[in-house]
């Protein structure tokens, strides 16, 4: 369903000012994107429009897209929810009006650990928090940890991840599989290598399998992903071979598909269905407690 609040207008004015040809083309293209995708980041919209040759592959082109998207939202032409932003967030403890409300929420959100019958655990590592809202729908559905590193992972973040893998192995004999989504540039490759190297160093003897899920060389060629100039400020920029491609250049549906396919290859359908059935029964027990309390 389209994320537009109302249909795209034919007027060539915005707030009384005439819109140029590029601005109109951007608005029309964004309108079309809402028919295909539920949510996107501004940078994903930019790459889609750059591939369509509506804007140039420059920071000026990005700012044009950013400006029109913001104006469309303020003018009521684009749902505020269409553009996702995982870079800002708030913390607040969850609270309830009544005990009954708390019990109802507990029953509604109850999740059984469906992976306990799969003898493994999965983590999806993501370089950019701006893309977290795109990926989290899949990771939440499959009850998989989404590890957002925001570029280079901190030593603490890596150590905690290694300790979680170690605990799973020593306590339950569960191996860890890591799927990493990082830019194809010097910084992204370095961040991915660090994960692959340091987790086993912190947890020697623990089976940790690392896979670079994206952006891969094959994806760049097969999907004709747009590139960008490499970050020359990176100390390893001169050593990086090939075109720099941001994770945002992967269309949302393909990004979601990558994650889901990676997860599903580890799922045994029969045991998963059994665990889901048990989960349903346990949730009904909780709902019965709510009814009795009422």
Where are these regions (language model features)?
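Nucleic-acid enzyme cleavage-core boundary/entry regions
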Residues: 1-176, 189-294
């Amino acid at each position: 369903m389209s994320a537009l609040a109302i249909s795209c207008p034919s007027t060539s004015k915005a707030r009384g000012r005439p819109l140029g040809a590029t601005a109109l083309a951007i608005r029309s293209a964004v309108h079309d994107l809402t028919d295909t995708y539920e949510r996107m980041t501004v940078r994903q919209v930019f790459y889609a429009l750059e591939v369509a040759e509506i804007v140039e592959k420059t920071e000026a082109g990005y700012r044009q897209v950013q400006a029109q998207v913001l104006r469309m939202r303020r003018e009521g032409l684009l749902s505020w929810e269409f553009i996702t932003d995982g870079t800002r967030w708030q913390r607040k403890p969850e609270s309830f009006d009544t005990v009954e409300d708390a019990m109802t929420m507990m029953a509604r959100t109850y999740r059984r650990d469906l992976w306990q019958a799969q003898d493994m655990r999965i983590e999806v590592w993501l370089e950019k928090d701006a893309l977290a809202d795109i990926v989290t729908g899949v990771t939440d559905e499959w009850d998989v940890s989404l590890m957002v590193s925001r570029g280079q992972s901190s030593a603490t973040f890596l150590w905690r991840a290694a300790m979680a893998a170690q605990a799973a192995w020593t306590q339950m004999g569960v191996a860890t599989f890591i799927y990493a989504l990082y830019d194809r540039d010097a910084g992204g490759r370095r961040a991915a290598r660090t994960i692959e190297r340091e987790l086993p160093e912190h947890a020697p003897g623990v089976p940790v399998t690392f896979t670079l899920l994206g952006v891969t060389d094959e994806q760049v060629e097969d999907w004709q992903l747009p590139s960008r100039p490499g970050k020359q400020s990176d100390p390893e920029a001169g050593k990086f071979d090939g075109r720099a491609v941001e994770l945002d250049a992967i269309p949302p549906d393909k990004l979601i598909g990558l994650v889901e396919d990676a997860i599903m290859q580890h799922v045994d359908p029969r045991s998963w269905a059994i665990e889901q059935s048990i989960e349903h029964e346990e949730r009904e027990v909780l709902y019965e407690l709510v009814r009795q309390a009422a």
